[in-house]
């Protein structure tokens, strides 16, 4: 992809400061080697997540000043509904404070205890909400998604044979719905093809199964369809999004990604009965159905942002920046998930630290080491994120990854160069790195709040020796 300048001018800046090695060592120890527990003031370049970390436009800020803060019936809600109808094609909208709130509502509405929920790879919070509602998640993604080196252009696709086999095994009436994520975060930001979405729709129609989507990164998915799928080259992303969403009964949306806001989410659907149930629940858990736990200004910012995220020039630059970082790492021999995804570069931590077993938490270890080297914050997406099963045993995912997640409209390629240089330095001394172990394990979504220590420190403590120096010190 040729070099592309940012398709915007920068009107406001926020200073960031590089820290010393000593400061970073103290910070990561205080955080229990968990990058989620680091203070933002201790972070130089923050690639923890793209959720709620985007820079908003002047038009979004302008819309915020016009927000209607009425407790009920605010016109800001009408603006959001109008934008969703125009750009996504769904007539019915129920706002929530963020995507997690929408996941909670739809799980309670659609799942009867004992039912099954197939999907194209798990996502952490989605699966927890499904399980809390009494459902059982089944991964029906294609096998290529579990291979970091596979170059399949649509690694997010549903394996139609796996989906059919589950229907045959449990019966269509025992499937609450199928949840298709676009793109698939845990697979490396991988897209789903339009042909695959249509094929899943045909199966759902045959058996009367609800087809839902986690559409959080729908604009990026549409851009990949434009780039890779026959018949879509040259078509505007906005048009592809409308076609893509026309196949779904409804969507769960975190506005903090492809709506370019710092907070907010919603459910969008066609079925009045689902909307009625959502409104009954939202007043219990979120707020009135016309604000869903959000200020009116946030609804207005989201209404504008979801339009802006469908701009072709913006998306070409956004995905191009992610590729710039990924290609720098590839050129240095750093193992990453291929093809490079839409919102992040995913380092294959199992291959990067191939001398560590999965029980030695290679992805958690690598995220801590990158921070120690440069102050760059990344995120573990491996055994720690996968958690434990109903019997209390560790889940062992096939992918053990570190996610370098690029916030939208925030950093330049100079920042990406700093990140790449840091990862490459760590890669060059990877044999010195020892794993981590839990010292506190949170019982739910453990990757957020668990704490760790180096295995070498644990061994030294058991033997009464001083704690060894950190790698690279």
Curated annotation (Swiss-Prot):
GO molecular function terms listed in the Swiss-Prot or TrEMBL record: tyrosine phenol-lyase activity
Classification of source organism: Bacteria, Bacillati, Actinomycetota, Actinomycetes, Micrococcales
Full protein name: Tyrosine phenol-lyase
Assembly information from the UniProt record: Homotetramer.
Enzyme Commission number: 4.1.99.2
Record-stated family: Belongs to the beta-eliminating lyase family.
NCBIfam families on file: PRK13238.1, tyr_phenol_ly
SUPFAM superfamilies in the record: PLP-dependent transferases (SSF53383)
Cofactor (UniProt): pyridoxal 5'-phosphate
Pfam families on file: Beta_elim_lyase
Keywords noted in UniProt: Lyase, Pyridoxal phosphate
InterPro entries: ArAA_b-elim_lyase/Thr_aldolase, Beta-eliminating_lyase, PyrdxlP-dep_Trfase, PyrdxlP-dep_Trfase_major, PyrdxlP-dep_Trfase_small, Tyr_phenol_ly
Origin species: Intrasporangium calvum (strain ATCC 23552 / DSM 43043 / JCM 3097 / NBRC 12989 / NCIMB 10167 / NRRL B-3866 / 7 KIP)
Reaction(s) catalysed by this chain's protein: L-tyrosine + H2O = phenol + pyruvate + NH4(+)
One GO biological process term: tyrosine metabolic process
Positions where N6-(pyridoxal phosphate)lysine occurs in the chain: 257
First-tier enzyme category under EC: lyase
């Amino acid at each position: 992809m040729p070099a592309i300048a940012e398709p915007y001018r920068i009107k406001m800046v926020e200073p960031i400061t590089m820290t010393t090695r000593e400061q970073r060592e103290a910070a990561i120890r205080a955080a229990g080697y968990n990058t989620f527990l680091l203070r933002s003031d201790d972070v130089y370049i923050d690639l923890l997540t793209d959720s709620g970390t985007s820079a908003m436009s002047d038009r979004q800020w302008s819309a915020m000043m016009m927000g209607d803060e009425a407790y009920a019936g605010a016109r800001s809600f009408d603006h959001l509904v109008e934008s969703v109808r125009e750009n996504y094609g769904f007539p019915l909208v129920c706002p929530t404070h963020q995507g997690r709130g929408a996941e909670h509502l739809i799980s309670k509405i659609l799942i009867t205890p004992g039912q099954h929920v197939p999907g194209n790879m798990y996502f952490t919070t989605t699966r927890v909400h499904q399980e809390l509602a009494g459902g059982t998640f089944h991964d029906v993604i294609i096998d290529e998604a579990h291979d970091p080196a596979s170059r399949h252009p649509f690694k997010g696709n549903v394996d139609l044979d796996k989906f059919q086999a589950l229907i045959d095994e449990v019966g269509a009436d025992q499937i609450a719905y199928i949840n298709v994520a676009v793109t698939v975060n845990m697979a490396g930001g991988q897209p789903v093809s339009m042909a695959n979405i249509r094929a899943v729709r045909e199966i759902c129609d045959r058996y009367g199964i609800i087809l839902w989507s986690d559409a959080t990164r729908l604009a990026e998915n549409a851009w990949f369809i434009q780039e890779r799928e026959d018949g879509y080259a040259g078509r505007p992303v906005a048009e592809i999004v409308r076609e893509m969403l026309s196949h779904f009964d409804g969507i769960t949306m975190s506005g903090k990604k492809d709506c370019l806001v710092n907070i907010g989410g919603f459910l969008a659907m066609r079925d009045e009965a689902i909307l009625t149930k959502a409104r009954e629940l939202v007043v219990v858990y979120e707020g009135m159905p016309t604000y869903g736990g959000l200020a009116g200004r946030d609804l207005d910012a989201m209404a504008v942002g979801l339009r802006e995220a469908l701009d072709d020039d913006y998306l070409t630059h956004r995905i191009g920046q992610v590729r710039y970082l990924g290609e720098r790492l590839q050129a240095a021999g750093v193992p990453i998930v291929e093809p490079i995804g839409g919102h992040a570069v995913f380092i294959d931590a199992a291959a990067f630290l191939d001398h560590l077993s999965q029980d030695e938490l290679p992805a958690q270890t690598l995220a801590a080491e990158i921070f120690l080297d440069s102050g760059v914050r990344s995120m573990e997406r491996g055994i720690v994120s996968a958690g434990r099963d109903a019997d209390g045993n560790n889940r062992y995912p096939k992918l053990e990854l570190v996610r370098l997640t690029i916030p939208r409209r925030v950093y330049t390629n100079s920042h990406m160069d700093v990140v790449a240089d840091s990862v490459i330095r760590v890669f060059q001394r990877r044999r010195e790195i020892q794993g981590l172990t839990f010292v506190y394990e949170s019982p739910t979504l453990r990757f957020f709040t668990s704490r760790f220590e180096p295995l070498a420190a644990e061994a030294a403590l058991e033997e009464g020796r001083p704690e060894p120096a950190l790698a690279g010190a």
